[in-house]
């Protein structure tokens, strides 16, 4: 029983970091357009993702898709781009 309490406390203290696979977005809900995977990989990793790729002819056109992107980085939400 004591072990269960200690493990629970350790998890609460450590916190849980989550990440998501998503299209990285600018503050105006516009995606980053791309032509090369290397551009997206650099952009995504600089923002804390594990990696990134250029998703050609995807949902949002040619846009950067990041893998394991932290929750504090903006992603493309449904709705229009507000340029």
From Swiss-Prot:
GO CC annotation, single: extracellular region
Span of the signal peptide: 1-18
UniProt tissue specificity: Expressed by the venom gland.
Domain LCN-type CS-alpha/beta: 20-82
Gene3D superfamilies the record matches: Knottin, scorpion toxin-like
UniProtKB keywords: Disulfide bond, Ion channel impairing toxin, Neurotoxin, Secreted, Signal, Toxin, Voltage-gated sodium channel impairing toxin
Entry-linked PROSITE patterns: LCN_CSAB
Cell location: Secreted
GO biological process terms, semicolon-separated: defense response
SUPFAM superfamilies: Scorpion toxin-like
InterPro entries linked to this entry: LCN-type_CS_alpha_beta_dom, Scorpion_toxin-like, Scorpion_toxin-like_sf, Scorpion_toxinL, Scorpion_toxinL/defensin
Annotated GO MF terms: sodium channel inhibitor activity; toxin activity
Disulfide bonds: 30-81, 34-54, 40-64, 44-66
Pfam families (UniProt xref): Toxin_3
Functional description taken from the UniProt entry: Binds voltage-independently at site-3 of sodium channels (Nav) and inhibits the inactivation of the activated channels, thereby blocking neuronal transmission.
Free-text comment about domains: Has the structural arrangement of an alpha-helix connected to antiparallel beta-sheets by disulfide bonds (CS-alpha/beta).
Family assignment from sequence similarity: Belongs to the long (4 C-C) scorpion toxin superfamily. Sodium channel inhibitor family. Alpha subfamily.
The name this protein goes by in its record: Toxin AahP985
Organism: Androctonus australis
